[in-house]
Amino acid sequence: MLKYVVTDIGKMCLYIWPYRVWSWRRLFIFRVLNVVSIAILFETPHRLALVPNVCLYTHMAIPLSTCLFCLCLCICIKYDITQTQANNQFLASFFVLILTINDLDVTFVI
């Protein structure tokens, strides 16, 4: 089950990373690190600080939408809100908001 969830997350990540700003090498390394950290997060939800730590260790400019994406995943894991139809609609709206923010190219450096 975890393998499929992480694969889906990896596919979703393809649509939010800023291709125009990062080199392919930097993009690939950060994507792998982030997907691995999310996989560990699914196994051990109490380690919610792991995703920001990966961002910190890579010393990269991070799009605001990526942090919101990770935050949304943490909330889903912690409160298990992916089960009901209403919550699925909320998550869909939230991801649309994330993609909109990403189009604005709002970035900051951790």
Swiss-Prot record:
Q: Give the top-rank taxon of the lineage listed in the UniProt record for this protein.
A: Eukaryota
Put simply, this protein is called: Uncharacterized protein YCR041W
Q: Name one GO biological process term.
A: chromosome segregation
What GO cellular component entries does it have? membrane
- Predominant subcellular localization, coarse grouping: membrane
Q: Does the record bear Membrane in its keywords? A: yes
Q: Where in the cell is it found?
A: Membrane
Q: What is its membrane topology?
A: Multi-pass membrane protein
Taxonomically, what lineage is the organism?
Answer: Eukaryota, Fungi, Dikarya, Ascomycota, Saccharomycotina
Report keywords, A-Z: Chromosome partition, Membrane, Transmembrane, Transmembrane helix
Q: Report the protein's function.
A: May play a role in proper chromosome segregation. Suppresses the high-frequency loss of mini-chromosomes when overexpressed, and this suppression is completely dependent on silencing protein SIR4.
User: Where does the chain cross the membrane?
Assistant: 32-52, 57-77, 90-110
